[in-house]
Every structure is written in C-alpha cells, then in structure tokens.
Amino acid sequence: RYPGTAVARFLARYTAKLAPTALHFEAARKLGFFDVSPRWKDFSYELCLDATMAMSTAEGYYPAWDGMLMKRFDSFIPDKIPVTIIFGDTDRTLPATTCQERSVAPNHAKWIIFPNTGHAPMWDSPLDVIDEIKKTVALAS
C-alpha cells in the first residue's frame, strides 16, 4: 500500500523542524534526495528545503496515493488530445520494470525517457521538461 516515497514522506514529516539547518549539509541532502535523483548533488538548498517542507505538510499525500492505486488510462482518449508521458531513466519510485506500462497508455501517447533523470524530471531536466510541455501544447492548438 505504501508508495515508493513513503520513507521520504516519513523523513520529511519528522525532521521538518531540523530541515532549515540540516539541509545546508550534504549528508542531509543525500539522505533525502539520493533515491529521488542521480543529480541530487546539484540541487539548490532552496529546492531541497521547499520539497522537504511540502512533503512534510502534505496531508493529502496518502489519500492521493490511495486514489491512484490501480488507476490507469481506463477510458478512450481521442487522438486529437495529445498525451506525453515522461519518465527518468533512473526513476526508483516508478521503475521501468514494474511501473512504466506502455500497453495501458493511449496508442498515440508520446513516451519520453530522459537520461540521467530520476523521479522528478522537472528537477533533473527542467529545460527538457519545458520543451516537451511546449511541444505538447502546440499539438493541442
């Protein structure tokens, strides 16, 4: 039942008061972000603190997770609605072997795997994510 990020949620929730000081140290950033990203060392203090505080106060975290369990593309999505699915090649939260099922996505979906990118592509590959969003929006116009 627990998501792959349950440990991160637990750590964030119970260390939130320490985070503003602790995240100045590489060991604390590694503890919180090593499993999320291969580029965790490049993350700014602000990104780590914002993510930690958001995770620690997200009361809807488990209800949202529960709501997504076993949810798939379960109804027809017309070809005129562009669908882009982005994963990182080192995503340990939703690994390719168990969670990236192309067969359940619409046939017309564009499937992208960013290299050297973890569970949060917007952190690891922000410019690439922006580019793909722009391309997808252009298709919808």
Name what the model sees in each region.
Residues V129, I133, V137:
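Hydrophobic "lid"/C-terminal helical patch
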Residues T93, F114-I130:
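Catalytic histidine-centered segment of alpha/beta-hydrolase-like enzymes
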Residues S141:
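Alpha/beta-hydrolase-fold serine-hydrolase catalytic core, especially in secreted/extracellular enzymes
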Residues R1, P95-T97, W123:
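Short glycine-/acidic-enriched loop or helix-start segments at secondary-structure transitions
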Residues T57-V104:
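Conserved serine/cysteine hydrolase catalytic core
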Residues P20-I77:
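Conserved alpha/beta-hydrolase catalytic His-Asp/Glu region
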Residues R1-K17:
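Flexible "cap/lid" loop of the alpha/beta hydrolase fold
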